[in-house]
């Protein structure tokens, strides 16, 4: 059976540091470093991933590339005194993962749009880049689309800030079931934050 074009794209992205994609990514990242933190782009970098996440090349659907710093929290050293245990500056991490941060920043930049999903497109020593798929819930092309019209409902407003995207659900521990996931449902807060 003949392979689809998407399967070749998917195979190339399994090891983006090797082969032809490595040179292409090297050139891309030089351009990305000179761009802003949130940039609207014409078309997805990873078409296979974007399509699997719900992207369609139609009106009302846009893609934005977001860069977020890598590593742990950026915490300033305290000026006032405190005991050693409370003086921590390094090795303090946020409970929210970088992909979620990227989605939220894109949503704040485009407040009239709703985040559908996102995926990674690369990283260097300082930052990670994600592409975020955003949907216009007021566009007739979206309201009449059988696959995307659900995002127009009122209960999907601010969905990214409530952890309802794929990255948000993973970050809340909702990707697993059974043993080890007892404290993640119905929510982390209802279990005293013991789920993570």
Curated annotation (Swiss-Prot):
InterPro entries reported in the protein's UniProt record: Rbsml_eL15_core_dom_sf (IPR024794), Ribosomal_eL15 (IPR000439), Ribosomal_eL15_arc (IPR020926), Ribosomal_eL15_CS (IPR020925), Ribosomal_uL23/eL15/eS24_sf (IPR012678)
Positions in coiled-coil regions: none
GO terms under biological process: cytoplasmic translation
Keywords: Ribonucleoprotein, Ribosomal protein, RNA-binding, rRNA-binding
Gene Ontology molecular functions: rRNA binding; structural constituent of ribosome
Keyword presence, Ribonucleoprotein: yes
Domain of life per record: Archaea
Region Disordered, annotated ranges: 72-93, 163-196
Single GO cellular component term: cytosolic large ribosomal subunit
Pfam families assigned to the protein according to its UniProt record, in alphabetical order: Ribosomal_L15e
Entry keyword annotation includes RNA-binding: yes
Subunit structure: Part of the 50S ribosomal subunit. Interacts with protein L7Ae and weakly with L44e.
Family: Belongs to the eukaryotic ribosomal protein eL15 family.
Protein name: Large ribosomal subunit protein eL15
